[in-house]
Amino acid sequence: MSLDTVDKLVVFLAKRDGIDKLVKTFQYVAKLACWHVEATRPEAADRFKKWEVASGLSRKAFRTGRSLTGFNALRRNPGATPMIRFLAVLANSGEMVYFFFDHFLWLSRIGSIDAKLAKKMSFISAFGESFGYTFFIIIDCIFIKQRLKSLKKLQHSTDEPKEEIGAKISEIRGDIVMRLMGISANVADLLIALAEIHPNPFCNHTITLGISGLVSAWAGWYRNWPS
């Protein structure tokens, strides 16, 4: 029996990444809503701000232990070539720094440790995030280039039955789409991290942060949605 939309939603939300993307959507919708009404409806803006902050803190709690994900990825599947393995070490190391120091950022913001540490923890976490995601983007670009070459060969191949070629083409196209979604999410998160590392009018504008957050969340929805 195939899964319907409700079944898929239940499976999606059962995943830690699934609930994270839902709460991330709440966080950045609230950020944009707060910005939209802050001049005309300060009470509503305050409520949206509280929703944004609560969502952000909830996401940090959900990510407890996520620093082990990158370590396990390197341990189990470091990459097929020396170049990919090297890039994977850089990418996952950056992500591990991001998630590890994000734990301390969360603890400082809820008052469990010195609140003065929040700014330093936020900077280190954002630096690790931007470093790691830069290399994840490079890895995805390399794989997309390889997939496009394979796709071109298959489209001109006459050695296999059309059904098999069609299935392989569909699989390659699906992988390309997933990697494009990954690049979209990582670029969006990179902009958010840059706003913390090197504040500037573009990256720190509410519209930039809000749209980047939603792009990242919705790309994650697409990638984690059950097939």
Swiss-Prot record:
This is Peroxisomal membrane protein 11B. Pfam families: PEX11 (PF05648). The chain crosses the membrane at residues 86-106, 202-222. Residues 107-201 are lumenal. Belongs to the peroxin-11 family. GO terms for cellular component: cytosol; peroxisomal membrane; peroxisome. Residues 1-85, 223-227 are cytoplasmic. Keywords: Membrane, Peroxisome, Peroxisome biogenesis, Transmembrane, Transmembrane helix. Homooligomer. Interacts with ARC5 and FIS1B on peroxisomes. PANTHER family: PEROXISOMAL BIOGENESIS FACTOR 11, PEROXISOMAL MEMBRANE PROTEIN 11B. It comes from Arabidopsis thaliana. It is found in: Peroxisome membrane. The gene is PEX11B. Expressed in roots, leaves and developing siliques. Induction: In seedlings by transition from dark to light. Up-regulated during senescence.
